[in-house]
């Protein structure tokens, strides 16, 4: 099962694999990775032993079950799959039966919400749907307790963090880059995309934040973690 070690470790985010089977959202295309590059990267991860990064998938694309699961199994790897309940059974996305199949294969199911919305802008009704109802549905389908969440678009603030803690989640996985610790609620991840060269991939595998990215990252962290934020209504 998926568990972030107490010592700091890199955590990777993958999205879609292979040719998309649904209409993509604006700006989503670069985050789709071909099967061959994905398999080559898994081979590198499998050779890293105790230093290997953790693996996560966002959005619940059909490629999670068609490509990711068999390739992970072939290498003895596991991952966390952060799923969108509102996309289940839609073309190009996982089915309800696929959620159970992932769980039965030893993979961890996490919450990505219901409709891929900005969690900072939720009103009480939205929080009910995105957090509680979606979580219950995933628990019913997977047979697992849903204790991990990943913020859509990597967007969160102090209010989102407080709400998830109050709801009993163990961790919020972000898109902030860097290394994650199992001792902390907020856990940064390193996003893999099709434009990355070998140097960028190596930095992601290690969780190293490049110097050119550090000022923007620090500013983003300050905004997300220090500003109060809150719902739109």
Regions found by a protein language model. Give the residues of each.
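N-terminal pre-catalytic segment of deacetylase/amide-hydrolase enzymes
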Residues: 1-53, 219-233
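Active-site-adjacent pocket scaffolds in enzyme catalytic domains
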Residues: 2, 77-110, 114, 158-233
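Short, charge-rich binding segments
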Residues: 3, 70-75
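Metal-dependent polysaccharide deacetylase catalytic core of the NodB/CE4 family, i.e.
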Residues: 9-24, 28, 51-54, 73-160, ...
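Soluble or luminal CAZymes and related metallo-dependent hydrolases
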Residues: 33-37, 60, 91-94, 126-133, ...
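Amphipathic alpha-helical segments that form well-ordered structural scaffolds
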Residues: 37-44, 67, 71, 133, ...
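Short acidic, Gly/Ser-rich segments with clustered Asp/Glu that frequently serve as metal-coordination loops
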Residues: 59-67
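Short, function-defining helix-loop hinge/capping sites that tune catalysis or transport
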Residues: 66-67, 120, 197
């Amino acid at each position: 099962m998926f568990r972030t070690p107490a010592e700091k470790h890199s955590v990777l985010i993958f999205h879609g694999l292979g040719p998309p089977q649904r209409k993509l959202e604006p700006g989503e295309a670069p985050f789709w990775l071909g099967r061959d590059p994905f398999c080559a990267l898994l081979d590198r991860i499998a050779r890293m032993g105790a230093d290997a990064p953790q693996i996560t998938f966002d959005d619940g694309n059909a490629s999670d079950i068609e490509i990711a699961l068999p390739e992970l199994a072939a290498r003895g790897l596991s991952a966390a799959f952060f799923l969108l309940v509102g996309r289940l059974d839609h073309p190009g996305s996982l089915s309800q039966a696929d959620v159970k199949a992932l769980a039965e294969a030893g993979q961890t199911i996490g919450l990505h919400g219901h409709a891929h919305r900005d969690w900072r802008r939720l009103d009480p009704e939205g929080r009910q749907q995105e957090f509680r109802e979606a979580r219950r549905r995933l628990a019913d389908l997977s047979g697992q307790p849903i204790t991990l969440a990943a913020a859509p678009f990597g967007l969160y603030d102090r209010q989102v963090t407080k709400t998830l803690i109050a709801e009993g989640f163990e961790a919020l996985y972000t898109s902030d880059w860097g290394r994650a610790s199992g001792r902390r609620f907020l856990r940064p991840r390193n996003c893999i995309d099709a434009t990355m060269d070998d140097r960028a991939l190596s930095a992601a595998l290690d969780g190293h934040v490049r110097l050119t990215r550090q000022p923007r990252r620090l500013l983003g962290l300050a905004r997300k973690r220090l500003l109060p934020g809150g719902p739109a209504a």
